From Swiss-Prot:
Belongs to the oligoribonuclease family. GO terms for biological process: rRNA processing. The active site is at 202. It comes from the Eukaryota. This is Probable oligoribonuclease. GO terms for molecular function: 3'-5'-RNA exonuclease activity; nucleic acid binding. 3'-to-5' exoribonuclease specific for small oligoribonucleotides. It comes from Schizosaccharomyces pombe (strain 972 / ATCC 24843). Its main location: cytoplasm.
Length: 252
């Protein structure tokens, strides 16, 4: 009798273990089993929100058209400060910041009403340090000429950006920095705009890391289409859209 009881108990435990393992596996890899049409529709939910052409924006702090533009400061939970910089190159100390943009979102990627974008005044000596890629790309986008015409110093931009961040996130070390390969931006900001780095948390959310993990662990997830015009504000919008893309397919 006791043997039969133990045998039944073992069978029951085995059933529950298998059920747990199966449920966990199915949940974590649910995106692999979605029908192609359904998966496509999931991604389309977020793309129109952020894929806006803002490369011609000339305002320092301006409105961001979004279904979530009424997000209030009191509702900003787990805030993220999305930052993107354009530089004359990638060598800190030799190259300098050209443009800095930022958008603040909550933890669910809903942006606040305002966005930040500023171009820094550079002299010809600083511009002459650009490599061939930067000369071509920033010349084509019009950023080089805007740096010549700008009247904002790097300290002007630092103070204005800090004011923008503090308006929504007054507490230090609360908001994480987010972006694509944002560690490169952080290196330049640490030197040229240390007040920004001091106010934000040391942890970062790097969308490029998630992209690389998705390629290795869920290679069937389609790539996120990016315009890639290498202007700071439009790059941020694409980064937010890209993270929404991976969240919809994989991380939900």
């Amino acid at each position: 009798m006791q043997g039969a009881f133990l045998n039944n108990r073992i069978i029951l435990q085995s059933y529950h273990i298998k059920k747990r393992l199966y449920s966990k596996r199915t949940s974590s890899l649910h995106s692999r089993f979605l029908q192609p049409t359904y998966r496509k529709n999931i991604c389309q939910i977020s793309k129109p929100i952020f894929q806006q052409d803002l490369s011609t924006n000339t305002n320092f702090i301006s409105k961001l058209k979004s279904p979530f533009s009424n997000l209030k400061m009191s509702n900003l939970k787990q805030p993220l400060v999305w930052i993107d910089c354009e530089m004359t190159g990638l060598e800190v100390g030799k190259h300098v910041l050209m443009e800095v943009a930022a958008i603040i979102t909550d933890g669910n990627l809903r942006p606040v009403e305002e966005k930040f974008d500023a171009v820094i005044k550079l002299d010809e000596k600083q511009l002459s340090e650009m490599n061939d890629w930067c000369i071509e790309q920033h010349g084509k986008s019009g950023l080089t000429e805007r740096c010549r015409q700008s009247n904002l110093t790097v300290k002007d931009v630092e103070n204005q950006l800090l004011a923008y961040i503090k308006k929504y996130i007054p507490k230090k070390r609360e908001a994480l920095i987010a972006g694509n390969s944002v560690h490169a931006d952080v290196r330049f900001l640490s030197v040229e705009m240390p007040k920004i780095i001091e106010h934000l948390h040391y942890r970062i959310i790097d969308v490029s890391t998630i992209k690389e993990l998705a390629k290795r662990w869920c290679p069937d997830i389609p790539a996120y289409d990016k315009k890639g015009d290498h202007r700071a504000l439009s790059d941020i919008l694409e980064s937010i859209g890209e993270l929404q893309h991976y969240r919809s397919y994989w991380l939900s």
